[in-house]
Regions:
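Terminal-region recognition feature
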Residues: 1-182, 186-189, 193-206
Length: 208
């Protein structure tokens, strides 16, 4: 059948608008809590989570972020947790596809929110199925306490992250952690269970 050029143009225009909107939403999420908090991270001599991933990945290779819109549009009181406060992405490191899990230190100092555990667990599950090394970029102030009752409960609560750590280890999937500054409570368990841990001079771990 002949191509309906008018229909094609109409749908192409509508799709272009949606792609533009999607790009805007991705940019909003990438800014975390905004320029003020990005600047606060930089004033501490740190990089943001996405800047760390950019520095880690092989040059001129893509970063395939997953779970970008977890918690999108959801409010916790007057606060938001863009991407659930954690960046999960596939990227190539030393020529090998890798799953990177990085706390977003522009959102409540990298704390965990509702859906943060599920997002981390999903990334771990993908790494396990694909046998991809996991790199944890940890800069985590622990659980966002006002929402703790919604973060631990259920079959996919925070404790299951550590079960995934064990399953990855049992399957022989490498797990490497880099700790930058805060590493408190649940955020501290992932480095402890990893095969290798690197810490900056100002980094510390507190297990609770």
């Amino acid at each position: 059948s002949a191509l309906d050029e008018q229909s094609f143009a109409r749908h192409a225009s509508a799709m272009a608008e949606k792609n533009s909107l999607l790009a805007e939403r991705r940019k909003e999420v990438a800014e975390g809590w905004g320029p003020k908090y990005i600047e606060r991270v930089h004033q501490k001599g740190k990089l943001t989570a996405r800047e760390r991933i950019e520095a880690l990945r092989d040059k001129e290779t893509p970063v395939r972020e997953v779970g970008t819109f977890v918690n999108h549009g959801v409010k916790f009181g007057k606060l938001k947790s863009p991407a659930a406060g954690v960046v999960t992405a596939f990227c190539q490191v030393a020529g090998r596809w890798t799953m990177v899990i990085a706390n977003d230190n522009t959102v409540a100092s990298g704390s965990w929110w509702p859906k943060t555990p599920e997002k981390i667990e999903r990334a771990q599950e993908m790494a396990l199925r694909l046998r991809l090394p996991v790199v944890y970029l940890v800069d985590c102030s622990g659980l966002f306490l006002p929402e703790q009752s919604r973060s631990f409960a259920g079959a996919t609560g925070a404790g299951h992250i550590f079960k995934k750590n064990a399953l990855l280890a049992d399957a022989g999937v490498p797990q490497i952690a880099a700790v930058f500054g805060d590493c408190i409570a649940g955020g501290g368990y992932m480095p402890i269970i990893s095969d290798r841990v690197a810490m900056t001079e100002s980094a510390y771990m507190v297990i609770a």
